[in-house]
Amino acid sequence: MHFFPIQLLVLFFAEKIAFAENSDQTVSRVDSNRYSVAAEKKFLLYDVNFGEGFNLRRDVYMRVANTVRSLRDSGENYILVLPPWGRLHHWKRMEVALSWRLFFDLESLNRFIPVIEFEDFLDENRPIDQVIYLQHYAEGWGTEYVRKFEKRSCLPPAESHYKQVEEFKWKGWFYSYEDVYSRNFQCVSIQGDSGTLKDLLKHSNFSESTSIMVDRAETILHEHYGEVDYWKARRSMRYSNDLVDVADAFRKKYLDSDDKRDKTKLVDDWTKEKPRRTAIGGPYLGIHWRRRDFLYARRAQLPTIPGTAKILQDLCKKLDLQKIYLATDAPDQEVDELKALLNGELEVYRFTDTQKLNDGQIAIIDQYLCAHAAYFIGSYESTFTFRIQEDREIIGFPISTTFNRLCPDTEPTCEQPAKWKIVY
């Protein structure tokens, strides 16, 4: 056996690390069979403002996931802890502590960054070392946008969300878990993106903590919106196999649609996907018809119910389609009115099996079915619509069949949505 002076070993690994940084390899990805790079395992948790809905939270996941990717690329051995779903503003049933595996394929998520469920985190980590409560600067952005952060006094409503019950013991919502607490709590004013959050975690005294929870994670923006790493994170968010099976059975039974005929089959491993625009979709029109609170916030941008019926009739005639899949939050009486205005000329289908599935699972099935339609039309500035457009980009539809919106009666040729095309 040969022995080497410790100085040579240090130099050897320093050169390997330098090489990794210069060649787009990273310490986190060094082949553990060849090199021994000791990196302490760390956990990043996060939460989002209560008022944010399911689809905005999916977007925040991508921001935080790219923070973890960036941390790992810089040599930090971070694992992302997935925040349990529940108590969401738009959900009819106030369920809590729902795991991600009910909605998404965890194996697919782990192909982008390492993730674990909160329950699995609790099995070996309790309490949380540090809660960082993100907030905007009280004085605003100023005359220019500068990426920055600093510890500040807490602004409302931070202090109503977390209470110190004794030294090194802070209580908060923590996804409804009663027996979870944090040793430390700190408010941080931040102005920036995923990269700014990475700098906060890496280049401050927070770096000494092994488990950090970032609350109000929606405060940070995407560092590279619409670029390669954005789409890698998005492509990793495959839906759970159980939900896909339910949706596929529905589209085959009612919509004459399947992957082979529609040319919508995806490879099992998203990292092996190739650019394409060959998807045809099922012989039906997919529509996301946003109602309820949008009638107050976006009334000028929405068609009336008769206006919606006319749009659907005109589109189906133009596209030679007889079936419509309707994803909507509209009350039943509004759906009935819409169907009546279609005069039985078109078949309207909805997924309504609410007994076995929760609100979030039904939302995903709605999106999946709209994403597999030959043509899709959505609602103005709706994150639900955005997620469908992203799904269709991943599946590989022609752009003209995806980026379409319902126009108000007063502006039938309204401006159509921005075309955020997939990047590989």
Swiss-Prot record:
Reaction equation(s) it catalyzes: L-seryl-[protein] + GDP-beta-L-fucose = 3-O-(alpha-L-fucosyl)-L-seryl-[protein] + GDP + H(+); L-threonyl-[protein] + GDP-beta-L-fucose = 3-O-(alpha-L-fucosyl)-L-threonyl-[protein] + GDP + H(+)
Positions annotated to bind GDP-beta-L-fucose: 51-55, 288-290, 366, 383-384
Glycosylation sites: 205
Pathway the protein contributes to: Protein modification; protein glycosylation
Tissue specificity note: Expressed in the anterior part of embryos, in the hypodermal and neuronal cells of the head. Expressed at different levels in a variety of cell types after hatching, including neuronal, hypodermal, muscle, intestinal, and somatic gonadal cells. Expressed in the nerve ring around the pharynx, in dorsal and ventral nerve cords, intestine, and a variety of hypodermal cells of L1-L3 larvae. Expressed in gonadal sheath cells, spermatheca, and tissues surrounding the vulva of adult hermaphrodites, and in the body wall muscle and hypodermal cells of adults of both sexes.
Disulfide partners: 154-187, 407-414
Keyword Zinc appears in the UniProt entry: no
GO cellular component: endoplasmic reticulum; Golgi apparatus
Enzyme nomenclature, EC number: 2.4.1.221
Signal peptide stretch: 1-20
Keyword set includes Glycoprotein: yes
Alphabetized UniProt keyword annotations: Carbohydrate metabolism, Disulfide bond, Endoplasmic reticulum, Fucose metabolism, Glycoprotein, Glycosyltransferase, Golgi apparatus, Signal, Transferase
GO BP annotation list: fucose metabolic process; protein O-linked fucosylation
Subcellular location: Endoplasmic reticulum; Golgi apparatus
Domain of life: Eukaryota
Site, Essential for catalytic activity: residue positions: 391
Active site: 52
Molecular function in Gene Ontology: peptide-O-fucosyltransferase activity
Function comment: Catalyzes the reaction that attaches fucose through an O-glycosidic linkage to a conserved serine or threonine residue in the consensus sequence C1-X-X-S/T-C2 of thrombospondin type I repeats (TSRs) where C1 and C2 are the first and second cysteines of the repeat, respectively. O-fucosylates members of several protein families including the ADAMTS superfamily and the thrombospondin (TSP) and spondin families.
Family membership: Belongs to the glycosyltransferase 68 family.
Matches recorded under PANTHER family: GDP-FUCOSE PROTEIN O-FUCOSYLTRANSFERASE 2
Name recorded for this polypeptide: GDP-fucose protein O-fucosyltransferase 2
Provenance organism: Caenorhabditis elegans
Source lineage: Eukaryota, Metazoa, Ecdysozoa, Nematoda, Chromadorea
